[in-house]
């Protein structure tokens, strides 16, 4: 039997009112790796807050002019996952794409529904990777940042989550 290698991550979690901050130990120092809010008093990037309209996200973040024509699918291409706001692939495709460049994309995640209109809630997600990469090409084990906005059926932001995923140590 092979022993599974697990990495112990030391975290400090602070919650105040409707805001949660997570600090993770990276190279001996605690670094902010997540912030999440369900409250209207917490401001995130581009001035966005819970309670704002989804239109404010569209106004604040880049999207391709024809984004509603860019469906994104599951890896096996059998299920519609949502729409690509910009970018041509998600992190699920990094293994096949093998890029040395920045990876930036935004998606509308239908959370299992077939469209925004049929979904009770959906998520707008923005993800960013930047070189240098451990192996020279972008991989899910490299560090990256992501911000996600939960949207209700009225087009209102109900939660905001920001994450920084630190580079995973190479298993050599």
Residue positions per predicted region:
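Second-shell loop/turn segments in exported
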Residues: 40-48
